[in-house]
Amino acid sequence: MAKPVSIEVYNPNGKYRVVSTKPMPGTRWINLLVDQGCRVEICHLKKTILSVEDIIDLIGDKCDGVIGQLTEDWGETLFSALSKAGGKAFSNMAVGYNNVDVEAANKYGIAVGNTPGVLTETTAELAASLSLAAARRIVEADEFMRGGLYEGWLPHLFVGNLLKGQTVGVIGAGRIGSAYARMMVEGFKMNLIYFDLYQSTRLEKFVTAYGQFLKANGEQPVTWKRASSMEEVLREADLISLHPVLDKTTYHLVNKERLAMMKKEAILVNCSRGPVIDEAALVEHLKENPMFRVGLDVFEEEPFMKPGLADTKNAIVVPHIASASKWTREGMATLAALNVLGRVKGYPIWHDPNRVDPFLNENASPPNASPSIVNSKALGLPVSKL
């Protein structure tokens, strides 16, 4: 490997060898693997993304499964190496898997796991946090105070945006987008406009019911509208949060032309995937529109930011921490481990990967199933009837 690596080993005489390319939060995931006869090896290589060659070295001559990260390039080379080592499964410790060549995994008969159903609320909470921080200019104000610049109250000091009664726009009303929308509607009495290829009836019913509640109590009811296009959301919303999947159709979804459609004092939040925004165009837009604000958790070419982004006062940037709550990260580690364990032991696939609470109950043994295998149909794997 390029740098010295320390390998932490649990249950060295275990029957099955499972490798984790990074230390993961909590210990439950380790205990679950060890209790089922696994030798667990954890790679400690801080502040470095493992290369393909590094991971091949970790896989070695015999490896039953690997738990990896979204930052790793899992393509044909790695799946070939894992297959030769007798491996049956790889799982991302992430809900996304755009770092994985699933077709290559299919070719070598390797199951690919992910961790949905555990990070919905925590990701939505960070999107809401970025929304508030941008609206009320919290980061700027914090720097102002720490710099010793505060000399007393002034009527124009860090004037920001009031969210109540404004319109929140959501692009991608899946689990996370809908959770975020509910937080902003119920928490701040914002009206909703959303765009999604599929109608979110459940979200619409929620906003309708909350609007009726407000009206019954003598307050202005909130409203909702399903937009016919993304451009409609961009033009009408005061605050816009992006929650699409990343594919060829959503790459640079927000570009120079679409940024120009937004209100001059709008707020844009992205906790989905970095490449859905043309980051270079965003930097120019921020420079040209000082009242426009953005909150970013993800970036086009992580871990780097486009030149100029770090210098803009109207941008809040955080290092891909949307899922970084203790319960969530430990849950993600557990699901990733159980994905690998399930395939190693020959268990079926859980029938609903979006309902994973039975795997996260620390007071009970998890079901004998892999929580979420994205290529289970392609591999012809059986589904649990539990």
Swiss-Prot record:
EC class name: oxidoreductase
The UniProt record lists the keyword Oxidoreductase: yes
Transmembrane segments: none
Major place of residence: other
Alphabetized UniProt keyword annotations: Glycolate pathway, NAD, Oxidoreductase, Peroxisome, Photorespiration, Pyruvate
Protein name, per record: Glycerate dehydrogenase HPR, peroxisomal
Notes on activation and inhibition: Slightly inhibited by oxalate.
One Pfam family cited in the UniProt record for this chain: 2-Hacid_dh
GO terms, molecular function: hydroxypyruvate reductase (NADH) activity; mRNA binding; NAD binding; poly(U) RNA binding
GO biological process, one term: cellular response to light stimulus
Catalytic reactions on record: (R)-glycerate + NAD(+) = 3-hydroxypyruvate + NADH + H(+)
InterPro entries: D-isomer_2-hydroxyacid_DH, D-isomer_2_OHA_DH_cat_dom, D-isomer_DH_CS1, D-isomer_DH_NAD-bd, NAD(P)-bd_dom_sf
Induction: Induced by drought. Accumulates in response to light, but transiently repressed in darkness.
Listed Gene3D superfamilies: NAD(P)-binding Rossmann-like Domain
Motif (Microbody targeting signal): 384-386
Binding site for NAD(+): R175, I176, C271, S272, R273, D297, H320, I321, A322, S323
Family: Belongs to the D-isomer specific 2-hydroxyacid dehydrogenase family.
EC number: 1.1.1.29
PANTHER family in the cross-refs: 2-HYDROXYACID DEHYDROGENASE-RELATED, GLYOXYLATE REDUCTASE 1
Role: Catalyzes the NADH-dependent reduction of hydroxypyruvate into glycerate in the photorespiratory core cycle. Mediates fatty acid beta-oxidation in germinating seeds when malate dehydrogenase is absent.
Effect of inactivating the gene: Very low NADH-dependent hydroxypyruvate reductase activity in leaves. Under short days, slower growth and delayed bolting. Slight accumulation of metabolites with long turnover half-times that become dissimilated during the dark. Perturbated photorespiration-related gas exchange. When associated with HPR2 disruption, strong air-sensitivity and dramatic reduction in photosynthetic performance.
Entry's Gene Ontology cellular component terms: apoplast; chloroplast; cytosol; mitochondrion; peroxisome
Organism: Arabidopsis thaliana
